[in-house]
Amino acid sequence: MFYDFVPQSRFLLGTAGYPSPQILQQAAEASKSEIITVSLRREGGQGGAFRELLTQLNKRILPNTAGCHTVKEAVTTAHMARELFNTRWIKLEVIGHADTLQPDPFALVEAARILCADGFQVFPYTTEDLILGEKLLEAGCELLMPWGAPIGSGQGLRNIEGLRSMRSWFKDIPLIIDAGIGSPSQAALAMEMGFDAILLNTAVAKAQDPRRMAQAFAAAIRAGYDARGAGLIERRDMATASTPIFGMAQFSSQEW
């Protein structure tokens, strides 16, 4: 589903901002996630200790270009990550606005085109814009990672109709909700809408109990995925009785 990898878990977990390496390890194990995202800047800042922790976790690593604002920065960071982690995967972020952390669509497409041509398997952090999604696919990406809301905001799925349209438009493309998820119920809703996976970081890292929150998200994501597969009933404007009339007792008016 994700290029050459078919995960059992639909939960991708970020590794930044945890109170301690021990709590990160507990949360990652509790999440049952098979894929964790890692910032090259974090790796560079903590060196061997963090690398040892990643080895202990024994999960597939998805390096990212967090903090990059230009094509050159993103491409350079991606090449460094490939050499360091020995992977073709790269979560491509090219930030266009410092306050909203919204991706720069023009730089994102250009960087994606360069990296795909260089043999990378690109996971692009994007918005729900359909044209931008088309351009990223044309550039060589085989999946898309639309945001639910701005990074770290916890707002959930801020543009539900836009995300529904994206899911409908890209029927056969893996879509991973990336950013803005704040609660397990929001993650479950995204899965019920037909998205393929959820990537989140802050909602677990900043929880009072990250390990327990990771468990909650894992359960919610699984529940949403199963509910979608089981077939959700259609919403109705009016009530529909669930109890059949057949078999009800019949009384004669004379008895009253």
Curated annotation (Swiss-Prot):
Enzyme Commission no: 2.8.1.10
Single GO cellular component term: cytoplasm
Protein location: Cytoplasm
Keywords: Cytoplasm, Schiff base, Thiamine biosynthesis, Transferase
Superkingdom: Bacteria
Any GO BP: thiamine diphosphate biosynthetic process
Xref: InterPro entries: Aldolase_TIM (IPR013785), Thiazole_synthase_ThiG (IPR033983), ThiG (IPR008867)
Gene Ontology MF terms in the entry: thiazole synthase activity
Membrane-spanning ranges: none
Recorded catalytic activity of this chain's protein: [ThiS sulfur-carrier protein]-C-terminal-Gly-aminoethanethioate + 2-iminoacetate + 1-deoxy-D-xylulose 5-phosphate = [ThiS sulfur-carrier protein]-C-terminal Gly-Gly + 2-[(2R,5Z)-2-carboxy-4-methylthiazol-5(2H)-ylidene]ethyl phosphate + 2 H2O + H(+)
Main location as per UniProt: cytoplasm
Main EC class the enzyme belongs to: transferase
UniProt-listed Gene3D superfamilies: Aldolase class I (3.20.20.70)
Family listed: Belongs to the ThiG family.
Main function: Catalyzes the rearrangement of 1-deoxy-D-xylulose 5-phosphate (DXP) to produce the thiazole phosphate moiety of thiamine. Sulfur is provided by the thiocarboxylate moiety of the carrier protein ThiS. In vitro, sulfur can be provided by H(2)S.
Official protein name in the record: Thiazole synthase
Source organism (scientific name): Erwinia tasmaniensis (strain DSM 17950 / CFBP 7177 / CIP 109463 / NCPPB 4357 / Et1/99)
Gene name linked to the record: thiG
